């Protein structure tokens, strides 16, 4: 029921990404999206509307339906400056790669073009950095190939970011990330009991706040929210295992 996750907005992008990675580790396929909305009080914003953007591979003909289909298929990357290219085993972002059981070595191809320097260009797999691509010269361009060992099901993406703010990017720091490429090895599911347990604790805290809250419009509104939390808890409890 969720077409994408807003990985970039008026938040800390690395912190948001860490939560996103946990959801991906639970087996959810969640493409990256971005957005800033447009609030009336612009003085409170750290950057203008459109500061964070989602780019979608929609083919040679651009129209609204193809663009939406590209978002849902995960053919996206999000950014406030750097532009990224990423493929794994000749598969593009958003693809599902199916491999036989056993160990494999897939070639990842990465590309970076940016109008500001970045300090890190990394391939993330199952929530961990699995490759760091060297950045040379002005740290604004890169093109490289890396061999990634793959032995279990999961996901891989490319991200770039800086350690500090860099004009003219009016954000905390330059940042960009592709959506994942998903890899299935044999019949292995993508699961993480630890990450599922993290969300169970999160749901417990939300439920406590919902029960204690006194600002509900009606009792049925509160009951509906609590019902949704019960459904969510059942999903993550099944993922967490016994």
Protein language model annotation of sequence segments:
Residues 3-13:
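The substrate-binding groove and active-site-proximal loops of carbohydrate-active enzymes
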Residues 16:
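Catalytic-loop motifs flanking and including active-site residues across diverse enzymes
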Residues 19-21, 25-31, 36-242:
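C-terminal functional module detector
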């Amino acid at each position: 029921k969720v077409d994408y996750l807003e990985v970039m907005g008026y938040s800390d992008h690395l912190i948001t990404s860490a939560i996103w990675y946990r959801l991906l580790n639970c087996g959810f396929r969640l493409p990256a999206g971005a957005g800033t909305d447009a609030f009336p009080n612009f003085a409170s914003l750290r950057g203008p509307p459109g500061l964070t953007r989602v780019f979608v591979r929609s083919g040679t003909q651009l129209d609204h339906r193809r663009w939406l289909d590209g978002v849902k298929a995960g053919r996206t990357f999000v950014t406030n400056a750097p532009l990224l290219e990423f493929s794994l085993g000749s598969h593009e972002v958003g693809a599902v790669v199916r491999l036989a059981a056993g160990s494999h070595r897939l070639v990842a191809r990465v590309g970076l073009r940016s109008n500001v320097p970045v300090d890190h260009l990394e391939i993330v797999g199952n929530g961990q950095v699995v490759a760091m691509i060297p950045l040379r010269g002005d740290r604004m361009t890169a093109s490289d190939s890396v061999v990634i060992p793959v032995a279990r099901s999961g996901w891989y993406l490319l991200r770039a970011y800086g350690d500090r703010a860099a004009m003219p990017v009016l954000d905390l720091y330059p940042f960009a990330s592709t959506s994942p490429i998903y890899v299935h090895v044999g019949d292995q599911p993508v699961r993480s009991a630890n990450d599922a347990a993290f969300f169970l604790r999160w749901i417990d805290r939300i439920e406590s706040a919902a029960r204690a809250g006194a600002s509900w419009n009606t009792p049925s509104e509160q009951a509906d929210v609590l019902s949704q939390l019960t459904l969510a808890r059942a999903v993550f409890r099944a993922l967490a295992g016994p």
